């Protein structure tokens, strides 16, 4: 794990076409935050500000060629049962994380949801052994 400073404006470039940020754009409903992030996209972005699992793509044509941008929110690994301080006891949050495969130019982002302490990724079940 590498610390990226200057919260909330720090950036970590995974490659030439994908950056990780904290993020600041929020949509009230599921899917709206990634759509807002794609509005002025010039690079694909992974962000976590909204604590939801969301993913969207946008194709922009330039010089007769498609350029595809992606915005991804990977959810949260925080508790979502109201114990985490916030403005409400119940939010539209989802637990999850992401796995990114990449080279210098291309990437693949997989979102992995965590449901009641369990995830399935590439056919294998992962289960929390933590305490309540």
Task: Give, region by region, the residue ranges found by the protein language model.
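Conserved beta-sheet core of the metallophosphoesterase superfamily
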Residues: 17-112
């Amino acid at each position: 794990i590498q610390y990226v400073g200057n919260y909330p404006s720090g950036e970590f470039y995974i490659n030439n076409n994908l950056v990780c940020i904290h993020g600041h754009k929020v949509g009230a409903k599921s899917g709206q935050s990634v759509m807002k992030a794609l509005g002025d996209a010039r690079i694909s972005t992974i962000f976590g500000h909204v604590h939801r699992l969301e993913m969207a793509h946008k194709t922009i044509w330039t010089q007769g060629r498609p350029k595809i941008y992606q915005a991804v929110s990977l959810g949260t690994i925080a508790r979502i049962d109201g114990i985490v301080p916030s403005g409400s006891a119940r939010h539209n949050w989802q637990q999850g994380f992401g796995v990114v495969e990449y080279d210098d130019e291309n990437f693949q982002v997989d979102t992995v949801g965590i449901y009641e302490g369990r995830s399935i990724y590439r056919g294998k079940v992962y289960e929390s052994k933590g305490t309540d």
